Swiss-Prot record:
Span of the annotated motif 'KMSKS' region: 576-580
Name under which the protein is recorded: Leucine--tRNA ligase
Organism name: Clostridium perfringens (strain SM101 / Type A)
EC number: 6.1.1.4
NCBIfam families, A to Z: leuS_bact
Top EC category: ligase
Amino acid sequence: MGNYSTAIDKKWQDKWAESGLYKFDPNKEVEKLYVLEMFSYPSGSQLHAGHWFNYGPVDSWARFKRMQGYNVFQPMGFDAFGLPAENFAIKTGIHPQDSTIKNIAKMEEQLKAMGAMFNWENEVVTCSPEYYKWTQWLFLKLYEKGLAYRKKAPVNWCPSCQTVLANEQVVDGACERCSTEVTKKDLTQWFFKITDYADELLDKLDGLDWPEKTVSMQKHWIGRSTGSQVNFKVKDSDLNFDVFTTRVDTLCGVSYVVLAPENPLVDEIVSAEQKEAVENYKEEAKKQSDIERQSISREKTGVFTGAYAIHPLTGKEVPIWVGDYVLATYGTGAVMAVPAHDERDFAFAEKFNLPINRVIEAKDGSETNLPFCEHGILVNSGEFDGLTTDEAKEKIVEKLASMGLGEKKVNFRLRDWLVSRQRYWGAPIPVVYCEECGIVPVPESQLPVELPYDVEFAPDGKSPLAKSEAFVNTTCPHCGKPAKRETDTLDTFVCSSWYYLRYPDNKNTEAPFNPELINKMLPVDKYVGGPEHACMHLLYARFITKALRDMGYLNFDEPFTSLTHQGLILGPDGLKMSKSKGNTISPDDYIKEYGADVFRMYLMFGFAYTEGGAWSDDGIKSVNRFVERIERIIDTAREAISKGENNKTTMDKAEKELNYWRHNTIKSVTDDTDKLQFNTAIARMMEFINALSKYTQEKEMNLDFLKDVVSDYLRLLAPFAPHFSEEQWNLLGNSYSIFNEAWPKFDPKALVKDEVEIAIQVNGKIKNKIMVSSDLDEEGIKAAALADEKIIASTEGKTVVKVIVIKGRLVNIVVK
């Protein structure tokens, strides 16, 4: 048993806090490094192994960077508003504010027990009025610039959470929080106009040091398509509608058009005979998720409206249908159907016996089955016959433009960000409604609009704040007459879309941040968190940064220069941890038994950081044995240094061998840690401790050299085992603190050995290994190999045909 324990942890945590070791000085004249882990929801009662896997290893990386000379800023806070905290409160019967504050206190205690060098003086908590005052300020600034607006729209509704969900919060047709099937509802909601930044959000992705998969996910989510917009007029009316298509070359093959069930045009054009059928169909469509509606394998459904459109080129009548495979949220909510050249249109046309007109043939004239979806040559297209797909796209758009019936168009899959929620635990939207003045933003001087405590927050589908007359009834800031407050609250993703900007200036009461300071401190240099945020938080933060830049508050384009996703720690059974499965890991229990450093080192050694894996009790036990072994070997070295006996001052063979391992380890650990490859870095340190152990068994040792080696080893180990290393550093008689020491630098000359080991093969089989001078030439190596006693014995009575020398590695002697 070693001496390392939680008592050592506590000793050094107190010392670090008392001495202000990690206090950040923004005026320090060295390169800053803003290291940020995604802050956690305080919705449960404590930190789990997943939190630790995010925070512990990244803290080690930040410590490593500090020792390399960077001015590291590593703040911590809590994403305290939103559904998780509110649902926890509903489940336990405790008010969200009370449970959240209690949970934060517990999680702060756990995070401090980790021994991370978080800058707690810069903490932010999103549910505090001091923070959400500025979230409301952000809303007002977006509203002022036309980037926040209110409209009635079909929205995603979770019947279980009793609230609206953004598109990004719907996964496979279900609520990402509770997995309940999502339905559609028409509600008046607040949106942020993220689509105004769609091009830049897409184009700037390739300049980021982000995981390729995350970049691809955002590109797909933004979904830029270059095509054409075509206008169709409705027969016998003044009505018309646009369709977006990437295949305008197939326009002459249109045999019907389809509107989304939610398209408002449907109610205007439906005939009396078809009205009941269309209404019934619209009701059924509300029960289907967007994922289900767009499934290729699902049988197509639809209903005829009784109305017809006029084809813009041919003048022919084409029937207007309603089909749920068309989404109101994509393009214009209407599609031109070309069944000969589109699989979904083909399936729909076959089912409802609609015309199928071929207008594209293969370039080589070969027979092709329908639907033929490739590019080719136009046929049955009048003046456009014989043109290639690309030529026809240009000519047809030119013709449509001359008629005022079409134009080139870029379309995006990205929709505006829906930010209002019918829940209690969120930042109130700073708007009032006045009969005289309409929508009136709350003046900045009246912020924050505080969330009242005494509110019935159990979900019933309405905004809980609407039940509080004291909150709702107010006076109009513009005319002074009675007015009503907005009772929806902001999506918690609004709170987290700008928190990284608040950390460096968290005590500012006059503004959300000082632009001069923030432009010096940001962007964040290293951001670490889960990949599940790819199309939500990470996209929203990019949008808010760009919007604030355009308002003149920021001088940078992107919030997070480099992004890493940590892997997932699974239960011992290899399954995702959950209380219901009974496979959760409590860090507190393991820390109590082994200490925070052993727990941290196991997470860093037992798993590749970006992959994660299944928890193993055997794994943490082996890391504990490793730490105990380090302690024993350093104790032995320290005792020898203290006694000063059998000392020598020369660098002989044993010293050179240890020096080689020392510098080899410095190089490897530096390279691996820089790339967050912590498991291989620790493996190198395990190898080095073997070499150190071997040296301490020498009869005579160079004790000054030994102290230097042990000091270097502790500096390498310090980011991975901060409390243990600080203690050992102190016991070695060094000055406080090891984290004020410089990171060791490797000496390339030390990696060139005086002697190297050469394997000797006879006819491909290894017979012996010998040590030779590293600068020995080929002839010298050959002579040394042939003179070796074991090789003489192995080749006796045989003729040496050939000797092959691979310098520095092996000699192969061919005999017969």
